Amino acid sequence: MKANELREKSVEQLNEQLLGLLRDQFNLRMQKATGQLGQSHLLSQVKRDIARVKTVLNQQAGK
């Protein structure tokens, strides 16, 4: 996901996406804790996506 794509979305869409990413992060953390996570890179990828969405939300709130 790219920041340019996120800037085109509305605040409601960004909030929905943020909620979905937080759920994904929770599920990945649970898989890691139980030893079921085979692709550990997904944790950092989701973390970065969450940061991107939050950054765009803050930028839009400042306008």
UniProtKB/Swiss-Prot annotation:
Q: Which keywords has UniProt assigned to this entry?
A: Ribonucleoprotein, Ribosomal protein
Q: Which GO terms describe its cellular component?
A: cytosolic large ribosomal subunit
Give me the gene this protein comes from: rpmC
Which HAMAP family does the protein's record reference? Ribosomal_uL29
Protein name as it appears in the record: Large ribosomal subunit protein uL29
Which positions make up the signal peptide? none
Q: Which family does it belong to?
A: Belongs to the universal ribosomal protein uL29 family.
Q: Does the keyword Membrane apply?
A: no
Q: Which PROSITE patterns match?
A: RIBOSOMAL_L29 (PS00579)
